[in-house]
């Protein structure tokens, strides 16, 4: 789905060593240098930092789309439109963006994002990681919360600066 947004030559995939061959098999348009193998599995932030610093060396003006590999996207046209709007916004504002999904039910399997207003792109008030059912029901009723999709968009320089400022242990 991202090949219609970004040329495959610009992809970077961060994965575990044991999945490298599988990634290359499933995405034949990319080369081995585009698959970054985590030295140690340590969650999302180190993977993002690894990709960001790799990309920073090659293209400091680049934008990044960070996405899990297992999303179900039913309307790819709408998805591409949203990603395009986010890329434009991130480019103009050096902002760190996350894509929220309007919840259809209370669900304890997702993290939630509370937004500050009802605009298409709005500031995040807070993140809540996988609430209990009662809190998820409250979130749904307020209309201020979205499921956290795990999709993030930013300029590489903006995320590197965020690592420097907020997670210096991941700043190279």
Regions found by a protein language model. Name each.
Residues 1-66, 74-80, 84:
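Conserved N-terminal catalytic core of the sugar/cofactor nucleotidyltransferase
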Residues 41-46, 105-107, 133-135:
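A short acidic, often aromatic-flanked loop/helix-cap motif at beta-alpha or helix-coil junctions
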Residues 14, 65-68, 98-102, 128, ...:
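Short beta-strand segments
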Residues 4-7, 28, 53-60, 88-95, ...:
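Generic secondary-structure signature for well-ordered alpha-helical cores
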Residues 62-64, 95-99, 108-111, 149:
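Generic beta-strand structural signal
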Residues 72-108, 118:
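Conserved donor-nucleotide/metal-binding helix-loop-beta segment in metal-dependent transferases, i.e.
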Residues 110-172:
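Catalytic core of tubulin tyrosine ligase-like
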């Amino acid at each position: 789905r991202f090949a219609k947004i970004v040329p495959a030559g610009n992809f970077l995939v961060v994965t575990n060593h044991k999945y490298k061959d599988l990634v290359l098999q499933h995405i034949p348009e990319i080369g081995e240098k585009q698959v970054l193998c985590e030295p140690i599995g340590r969650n999302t932030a180190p993977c993002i930092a690894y990709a960001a610093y790799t990309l920073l060396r090659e293209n400091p003006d680049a934008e990044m789309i960070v996405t899990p590999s297992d999303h179900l996207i039913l309307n790819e046209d709408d998805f591409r439109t949203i990603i395009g709007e986010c890329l434009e916004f991130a480019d103009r504002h050096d902002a760190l963006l996350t894509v929220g999904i309007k919840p259809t039910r209370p669900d304890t399997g997702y993290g939630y994002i509370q937004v500050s207003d009802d605009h298409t792109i709005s500031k995040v008030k807070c993140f809540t990681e996988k609430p209990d059912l009662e809190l998820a029901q409250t979130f749904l009723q307020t209309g201020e919360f979205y499921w956290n999709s795990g999709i993030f968009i930013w300029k590489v320089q903006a995320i590197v600066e965020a690592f420097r400022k907020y997670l210096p242990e991941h700043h190279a």
